[in-house]
Amino acid sequence: MATFDDVKDVIVDKLGVDGDKVMPEARFVEDLGADSLETVELIMGLEDKFGITISDEDAENIRTVQAAIDYIESKQ
């Protein structure tokens, strides 16, 4: 199962944000300052970390930390 800490580690690594800013309700673009390239890198990082494939359509709907956790848990 995806844990908050595992997802947080990928976010901190890919977006270069302070871990204290990564909360379940945080939005990748608005709250964490991710640009379009960083969001693609984030999705790829989550795919690698959890051994899943995230379609482009699904990736567009993953906008918050909690949405990422929920999606990953639904695929495992």
Curated annotation (Swiss-Prot):
Official protein name in the record: Acyl carrier protein
Modified residues (O-(pantetheine 4'-phosphoryl)serine): 36
Annotated family: Belongs to the acyl carrier protein (ACP) family.
Encoding gene per record: acpP
Membrane as UniProt keyword: no
Swiss-Prot/TrEMBL GO biological process terms: lipid A biosynthetic process
Signal peptide: none
Keyword Protease carried by entry: no
PTM info: 4'-phosphopantetheine is transferred from CoA to a specific serine of apo-ACP by AcpS. This modification is essential for activity because fatty acids are bound in thioester linkage to the sulfhydryl of the prosthetic group.
